[in-house]
């Protein structure tokens, strides 16, 4: 499998966070629309059998990756600087691979321009063009995002590189996440700026680039923050019962330690059984994550 970095430029507000597992689901729908149901079904059949055609990372500040979520003693951080260290969350790829965790920077230092806001909405009766008796205002959290990097681990024997680019282009036009039908979640990317990242994948310690399921792994240690995904069906499946069963995952930047040196490009497994609706039994969730090799923990 080949690891690619895709720089994107958001061109509208986003109402859903750019998380790898959600991105994967949206890409599956783009494959469905671009290449048909049979193509997607064949890809997902192998995906369930620990042969993922694609693993997608979260979106990160351009040129940076998240600091590993592990105890400060492994990060060589001073306990008296605990408050400041919590804000230092970004490392370059080189710093991360070399274990230079004390070089981590804050959003302000890297000039990350992400901004989150709440927009207030109200239900409108389109017959009367009034709000009605209930007066039910609600807030929608939206984000204005700076340029991002997203990593994709692609098996080109299953999904060709040109097919992947076409699918990503379709997704960028369709929009990502909540409220895409009214213009949210749009982004641009230049196909010529897609970069292949070549790494030595041998290590005892790895860091994840998206939420994943560590179930079944023979680990020495794992350091993580829990993340509960309350998923919803989208596109053609959003109308019967949109809600999926909750999934407990280890969030992005989890650190996995093994007893011996291993070679991994990704860890985790596909997650099924997300709905009791029989015709939705083929649904799978990305429980895989791209992993990067770290220095041994001392």
Per-range role (PLM):
Residues 1-298:
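Conserved active-site/ligand-binding neighborhood in enzyme cores
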């Amino acid at each position: 499998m080949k690891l690619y970095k895709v720089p994107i430029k958001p061109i509208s507000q986003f109402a859903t966070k750019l998380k790898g597992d959600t991105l994967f689901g949206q890409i599956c729908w783009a494959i469905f629309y671009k290449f048909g149901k049979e193509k997607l079904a064949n890809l997902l059949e192998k995906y369930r059998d620990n042969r993922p055609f694609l693993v997608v990372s979260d979106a990160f500040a351009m040129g940076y990756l998240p600091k590993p979520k592990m105890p400060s003693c492994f990060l060589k951080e001073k306990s008296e600087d605990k408050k400041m260290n919590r804000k230092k969350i970004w490392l370059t790829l080189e710093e991360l691979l070399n274990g230079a965790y004390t070089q981590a920077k804050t959003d302000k230092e890297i000039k990350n321009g992400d901004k989150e806001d709440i927009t207030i909405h109200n239900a409108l009766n389109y017959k009367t063009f009034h709000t009605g008796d209930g007066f039910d205002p609600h807030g929608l959290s939206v984000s204005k995002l700076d340029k991002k990097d997203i990593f994709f681990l692609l098996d080109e024997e299953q999904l060709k590189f040109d097919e992947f680019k076409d699918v990503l282009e379709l997704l960028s036009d369709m929009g990502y996440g909540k409220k895409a039908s009214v213009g949210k979640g749009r982004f641009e990317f230049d196909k010529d700026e897609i970069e292949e990242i070549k790494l030595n994948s041998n290590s005892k310690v790895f860091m994840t680039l998206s939420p994943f399921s560590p179930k079944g792994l023979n680990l020495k240690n794992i350091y993580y923050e829990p993340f509960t995904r309350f998923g919803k069906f989208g596109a053609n499946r959003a109308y019967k019962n949109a809600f999926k069963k909750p999934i407990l995952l280890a969030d992005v930047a989890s650190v996995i330690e093994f007893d011996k040196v291993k070679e991994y490009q990704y860890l985790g497994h596909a997650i099924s059984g997300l709905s009791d609706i029989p015709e939705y039994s083929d649904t799978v969730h990305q429980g895989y994550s791209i992993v990067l090799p770290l220095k041994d923990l001392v």
